[in-house]
Swiss-Prot record:
Similarity comment: Belongs to the UPF0301 (AlgH) family.
Protein name: UPF0301 protein ECA3925
Pfam family, one: DUF179
Disulphide bridges, residue numbers: none
UniProt lineage: Bacteria, Pseudomonadati, Pseudomonadota, Gammaproteobacteria, Enterobacterales
GO cellular component entries: cytosol
Matches recorded under SUPFAM superfamilies: VC0467-like
Record-linked InterPro entries: AlgH-like
NCBIfam families the UniProt entry points to: PRK00228.1-1
Coiled-coil positions: none
Length: 187
């Protein structure tokens, strides 16, 4: 089972403060474990513009039609000082890795320098921190019914309103997440 380019959808019973009602986009899943970013937990009062100001990045030439007041997401509980940018394909950046045909991840500063300009990727999601699982850990959590999985959808990733992403991801499975019992059982 390879869950790269899939969503993990937190089950209602998962009450961990970081992962409660979360949708995690899995960027990498292999024999070493898994790595992903939470895509529906924005940081309080912290925007892409704030990140650029803090890093003293002034993208030029600035296109005022491109909004920089988009939220920065809490990617996960690990390394919350590290930035990750999910974006639609663009080959101009130093450390971009293709996750799927329509999604890449970049960790280099050069992508930040394009935000707010016509050179930026068409769609972007900026996160600080990440989520990770050791080899076998995610599979164990799936067996414990902590998560649902579904192939990722770029519309949910980049266009669905943040507050609706958890329900929208579950709807891809034909599920109303609010109707799922928090109790596991056997038929």
């Amino acid at each position: 089972m390879n869950l790269q380019h899939h969503f993990l959808i937190a089950m209602p019973a998962l009450q961990d403060s970081v992962f409660k009602r979360s949708v995690v986009y899995i960027c990498e899943h292999n024999e070493d474990g898994a790595m992903g970013l939470i895509i529906n937990k924005p940081m309080d009062q912290f925007s892409v513009e704030n990140v650029l100001e803090k890093l003293k990045i002034d993208p030029t030439p600035r296109d005022p039609a491109i909004r920089l007041d988009k939220p920065v997401f809490i990617g996960g509980p690990l390394a919350d000082d590290r930035g990750f940018i999910l974006h639609t394909p663009c080959s101009d950046f130093g450390s971009s890795i293709s996750i799927s045909e329509d999604t890449m991840i970049t960790t280099s500063k050069d992508v930040l320098e394009t935000l707010g300009t016509l050179k930026q990727p068409k769609n972007t999601l900026v996160a600080l921190g990440y989520s990770a699982w050791e080899n076998g850990q995610l599979e164990e959590e799936l067996l414990e019914n902590a998560w649902l999985t579904t192939p990722a959808d770029k519309d949910i990733l980049f266009h669905t309103p943040i507050a609706e992403r958890w329900r929208a991801a579950a709807r891809k499975l034909g599920i109303d997440i609010h109707n799922i019992s928090t109790e596991a059982g056997h038929a």
